[in-house]
Amino acid sequence: MPGVKKRKVAREAPAPAPAQESDVESSTPEQTQEPEAQEQEQEEGQSKTFKELGIIEQLCEACETMGYKAPTPIQRESIPLALKGRDLIGLAETGSGKTAAFALPILQALMEKPQPFFGLVLAPTRELAYQISKSFESLGASMGVRSCVIVGGMDMVSQSISLGKKPHIIVATPGRLLDHLENTKGFSLRNLKYLVMDEADRLLDMDFGPLLDKILKVLPRERRTFLFSATMSSKVESLQRASLSNPLRVSVSTSKYQTVSTLLQSYLFIPQKHKDLYLVYLLNEFAGQSTIIFTRTVNETQRLAFLLRALGFGAIPLHGQLSQSARLGALGKFRARSRNILVATDVAARGLDIPSVDVVLNFDLPGDSPSYVHRVGRTARAGKSGLAISFVAQYDVEVWLRIEGALGKKLKEYDCPKDEVMVLGENVAEAQRQAIMDMKDYNEKKGSRGKKFGGKRSRDEMDQEEG
């Protein structure tokens, strides 16, 4: 039966092949996009199901169970090529379905030739690693797929025991994986068949480059490699040249900083001292909706969580100085809607599986345009609509103009009646005083633990977001 499926893929895949080959030889993204346009229209008309992409029935049923009704653009473009055994570079905006785009071909290949340590996925953060592992286990449940998560902040011995059980898939952050490759007796990836580097631009932004080089040196040359990224920087280009063999590039973004069409974006130009007031006003306006508030620092994340709790909002913080169990617990509550407000540093901006976020509020602007796109990409996912509002204080104008320039458009100012906002002043001031006391207690309990974030990060700390 697997052989029949292979022949079916071979019949369906050739149509887009010439365009993709020219894509590899082309030196600029603009040249890449144009020859694909007509082929993509034909492909969209023909490949509307996972089965038509070449995915076997067993995995199609798993997709249906998980609620994947139809392939997303990145899945439509990537899966047929991956099933043909090609190395891939996938460029797509956040929320595009990249995990299934690489997980399904790997699982299909695993069914044909099952073996331990079949696939390795490298991810920049612990939360993303757990999410990817969960996707593999859910899609491969009928096959009995075993996945193992190897990340910092967790016990090395228990991880070594998990590796000793020889899972099919390892999902890891680079620092902890390298620790095991160097120190765990009997652990080797010399028979690895598939390597995935997910959120490659983020991996490199977090200074994992030297660790990736060391990992690549101990992996077999005869393997398939998939590199997925939201943007194609010079660092990602260098990583591609070092790790992929004659890859095909698949891009479903038309702009370096594209946001989805169902996302409504606007801004509020307000004094720095009134940001808390406007935040509380907006949360009252969006009461009951799932909201992520992004801040620049761990301290501000924690302060806002205390402030909002004092006002009766169900707010939970998410940042890199929380324990791993606390971070997973916060995400679990937010996903389950037992808490509808998540106050976060950029640890939550990339790749985390939060199915339905209605509103994103940039309480603090990010420092660059890619980070803005990744933040607002938490809403308006999978065809749903969403709203993103950014707070622009008097000191943020230059940064905001750069973001608008990268987006290629001027965004509208959000209509917020000042007199209604100012009415909240007394209650918010009282909550601010309470938050100050709560922060004092919090910092006293934390003690000297925060000092470790001031020095050079160890491998174990590199996969947490410092905020």
UniProtKB/Swiss-Prot annotation:
Its EC number is 3.6.4.13. SMART domains: DEXDc, HELICc. GO terms for cellular component: cytosol; nucleus. It is an enzyme of class 3 (hydrolase). GO terms for molecular function: ATP binding; ATP hydrolysis activity; RNA binding; RNA helicase activity. Keywords: ATP-binding, Helicase, Hydrolase, Nucleotide-binding, Nucleus, Ribosome biogenesis, RNA-binding, rRNA processing. Residues 262-422 form the Helicase C-terminal domain. It comes from the Eukaryota. Residues 1-48, 439-467 are annotated as: Disordered. Pfam families: DEAD, Helicase_C. It catalyses: ATP + H2O = ADP + phosphate + H(+). Residues 79-250 form the Helicase ATP-binding domain. ATP-dependent rRNA helicase required for pre-ribosomal RNA processing. Involved in the maturation of the 35S-pre-rRNA and to its cleavage to mature 18S rRNA. This is ATP-dependent rRNA helicase rrp3.
